[in-house]
């Protein structure tokens, strides 16, 4: 049957990508339907019970700055919070939280059920409705046809998923859920380039059978307790719990080696490539054969369960081997396994077949987000979901798509890497992937993106008001520090020596003093009995006050580095956003090698910047391409997506 209501956007899948996509589309005013095979698993944390980490936390902050749900849901469900790399520079500091799975799902579902313009429906999707070169809807497993002008696919590991435990395997999207076999077959009929990837998860352990007296305790940060959302408060956090640490040993490694003859990875049963930066324990033992021990973190799954997640022993070994290797570790000698670990193989589609908007190049109105694009991780999925949902909404509103640049957001780095370089293994985000990471910090994600999000229709009034107060206070206080001066006469020598190590010998602005190593904002403001502080409180909100002080201090201390990076960005931007015509035949570009013209014709980059990052496309080839465009009068700079792009975002043409 044809469902009587027609929608603007349909989102298929209710994981981290799908929920952010649906919320973003609905926030923009698009009439949105979220189709999921099971409403009870909306926002499910399928693998580890944690959010954030190096690079990943940056993405979560960016999703939050654009009005997304992941950070706020983590603040409401997080049972341990830590700042990683806290002793290092601000560019690589990252927030990580352990989450209560049940509370996290509840927080996400609450937002979905209370979001205007968003409808939920429980049915697996088996088919897409395609007319000519555009998608027009989706068909469920019982034949209900839903019509829409755009569809966002966020199928996770469900596309033709196959679960492996030892040499036993069966179809499934994850343990306990069916695979999307029919939908996978339909996508293959559309001739979209695809491949197989693999990921895995460890066995879960009953905490009542763990001997914690033998383990090392790892508490969260308590002074101060971190928050994830820019609007978050520590008071929102539920009860906090520690994690625990144990280690593998030589006996563990011998047990694993003895089971490799029954490992689906090492017997050729699994063909998909696994994640390099989250390897299985059997892969670790093989790749790092000289290492005598590996650290294993025992992470609580929640406040109302005894289940623990042993982070570091993802495995697809036979269950008897899993049982033996778990029992070989200190503190786990009598541990009871609640769920076996397993590997899962699934289909993904080559992201080079996508525009930077995450719309497929072959089928108008069809967007992909999450693991279907070859990424791994909740955070990478959520960021893509928000972008795909935003652009699906803009597509039906006949507006140009938007995507941040590499110098503007980790989301921009993620998407650019995917659509220009593709993936040979599951892609995860690291700070090392960003050329401009000094400017792309967790702490300034809102300063980089919230104004753009407001223009795009993603940011509500409450977030905008809080951001505006913060932005204005940072600007005022920075200018005050730059324009307030102290001299040897006005600053007592003993105060100067206590703060700076010696008395000053000429006039300095407070900003110049703050720029010195080891000098803090509070230290500068405390000079002259506090007279160097602001005349009026910056804010009466203690959390916002800390954010303002952090922004002011980092902005002043790193001003020179940030300005140099901005100059580099400006130089590189000269050709980065020069658009390439849709119909250009690269075989006609004089001087291009056959290999280069073939790659450019295959991947159809949208800009000179994207073309330059395709493997094998040399700087000389880019120069030839620029000459060709100039001669033909074809090249043009990107336009803008409303006023949002004028704030710095790149745009992608949307075909209607």
Swiss-Prot record:
Example GO BP: tRNA methylation
Swiss-Prot/TrEMBL keywords: Cytoplasm, FAD, Flavoprotein, NAD, tRNA processing
SUPFAM superfamilies registered for this protein in UniProt: FAD/NAD(P)-binding domain (SSF51905)
Transmembrane annotation, as ranges: none
Comp. bias regions, Gly residues: 647-656
GO MF term list: flavin adenine dinucleotide binding
Cofactor(s) listed in the protein's UniProt record: FAD
Binding site for FAD: 13-18
Domain of life: Bacteria
Location within or outside the cell: Cytoplasm
Disordered: region residues: 637-656
GO cellular component terms attached to this protein's record: cytosol
Main location: cytoplasm
Annotated InterPro entries: FAD/NAD-bd_sf, GIDA_C_N, MnmG, MnmG-rel, MnmG-rel_CS, MnmG_C, MnmG_C_subdom, MnmG_C_subdom_sf
Binding annotation for NAD(+): 274-288
Family annotation (Pfam families): GIDA, GIDA_C_1st, SAM_GIDA_C
Subunit composition and interactions: Homodimer. Heterotetramer of two MnmE and two MnmG subunits.
Annotated function: NAD-binding protein involved in the addition of a carboxymethylaminomethyl (cmnm) group at the wobble position (U34) of certain tRNAs, forming tRNA-cmnm(5)s(2)U34.
Family to which this protein belongs: Belongs to the MnmG family.
Name used for this protein in its record: tRNA uridine 5-carboxymethylaminomethyl modification enzyme MnmG
Lineage, highest ranks first: Bacteria, Pseudomonadati, Pseudomonadota, Betaproteobacteria, Burkholderiales
């Amino acid at each position: 049957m044809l469902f009587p209501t027609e929608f603007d956007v349909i989102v298929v899948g209710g994981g981290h990508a799908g929920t952010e996509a649906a919320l973003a589309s609905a926030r923009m005013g698009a009439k949105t339907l979220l189709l999921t095979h099971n409403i009870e698993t909306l926002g499910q944390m399928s693998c580890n019970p944690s959010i954030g980490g190096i690079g990943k936390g940056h993405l979560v902050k960016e999703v939050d700055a654009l009005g997304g749900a992941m950070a706020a849901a983590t603040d409401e469900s997080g049972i341990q919070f830590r700042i990683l790399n806290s002793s290092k520079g601000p560019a690589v500091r990252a927030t990580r939280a352990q989450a209560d799975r049940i509370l996290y799902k509840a927080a996400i579902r609450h937002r979905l059920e209370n979001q205007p313009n968003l409808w939920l429906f429980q049915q697996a999707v088996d088919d897409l409705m395609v007319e000519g070169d555009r998608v027009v809807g989706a068909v469920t497993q019982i034949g209900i046809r839903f019509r829409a002008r755009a569809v966002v696919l966020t199928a996770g590991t469900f596309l033709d998923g196959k679960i492996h435990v030892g040499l036993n395997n069966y179809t499934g999207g994850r343990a306990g859920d069916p695979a999307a076999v029919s939908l996978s077959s339909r996508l293959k009929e559309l001739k979209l380039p695809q491949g197989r990837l693999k990921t895995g998860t460890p066995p879960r352990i009953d905490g009542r059978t763990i001997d914690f007296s033998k383990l090392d305790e790892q508490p969260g940060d308590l002074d101060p307790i971190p928050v994830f959302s820019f609007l978050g408060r520590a008071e929102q956090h539920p009860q906090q719990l520690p994690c625990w640490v144990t280690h593998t040993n030589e006996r563990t490694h011998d047990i694993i080696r003895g089971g490799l003859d029954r490992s689906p990875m090492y017997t050729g049963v699994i063909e998909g490539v696994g994640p390099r930066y989250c390897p299985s324990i059997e892969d670790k033992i093989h790749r790092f054969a000289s290492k005598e021990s590996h650290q294993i973190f025992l992470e609580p799954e929640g406040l109302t369960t005894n289940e623990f997640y042993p982070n570091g022993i993802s495995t697809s070994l036979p269950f008897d081997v899993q049982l033996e290797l778990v029992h070989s570790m200190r503190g786990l000698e009598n541990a009871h396994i609640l769920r076996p670990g397993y590997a899962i193989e699934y289909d993904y589609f080559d992201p080079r077949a996508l525009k930077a908007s995450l719309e497929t190049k072959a089928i108008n109105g069809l967007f992909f987000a999450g693991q279907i694009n070859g990424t791994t991780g909740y955070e990478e999925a959520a960021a893509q979901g928000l972008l795909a949902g935003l652009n699906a909404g803009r597509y039906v509103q006949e507006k140009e798509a938007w995507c941040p640049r590499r110098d503007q957001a980790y989301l921009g780095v993620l998407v650019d890497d995917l659509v220009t370089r593709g993936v040979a293994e599951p892609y995860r985000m690291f700070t090392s992937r960003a050329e401009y990471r000094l400017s792309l910090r967790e702490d300034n994600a809102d300063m980089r993106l919230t104004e753009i999000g407001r223009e795009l229709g993603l940011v509500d009034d409450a977030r905008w008001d809080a951001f505006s107060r913060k932005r204005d206070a940072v600007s005022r206080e920075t200018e005050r520090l730059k324009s307030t001066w102290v001299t040897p006469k006005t600053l007592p020598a003993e105060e100067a020596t206590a703060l700076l190590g010696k008395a000053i010998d000429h006039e300095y602005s407070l900003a110049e003093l703050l720029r010195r190593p080891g000098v803090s904002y509070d230290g500068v403001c405390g000079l002259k009995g506090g007279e160097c502080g602001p005349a009026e409180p910056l804010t009466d909100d203690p959390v916002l006050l800390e954010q303002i002080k952090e922004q002011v201090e980092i902005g002043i201390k790193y001003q020179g580095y940030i300005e140099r990076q901005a100059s580099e960005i400006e130089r590189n931007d000269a050709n980065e956003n020069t658009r390439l015509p849709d119909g250009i035949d690269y075989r006609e570009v004089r001087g291009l090698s056959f290999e280069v013209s073939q790659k450019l014709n295959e991947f159809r980059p949208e800009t000179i910047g994207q073309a330059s990052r395709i493997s094998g496309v040399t700087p000389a080839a880019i120069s030839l391409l620029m000459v060709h465009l100039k001669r033909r009068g074809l090249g043009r700079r990107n336009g803008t997506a409303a006023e949002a792009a004028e704030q710095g975002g790149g745009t992608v043409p949307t075909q209607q």
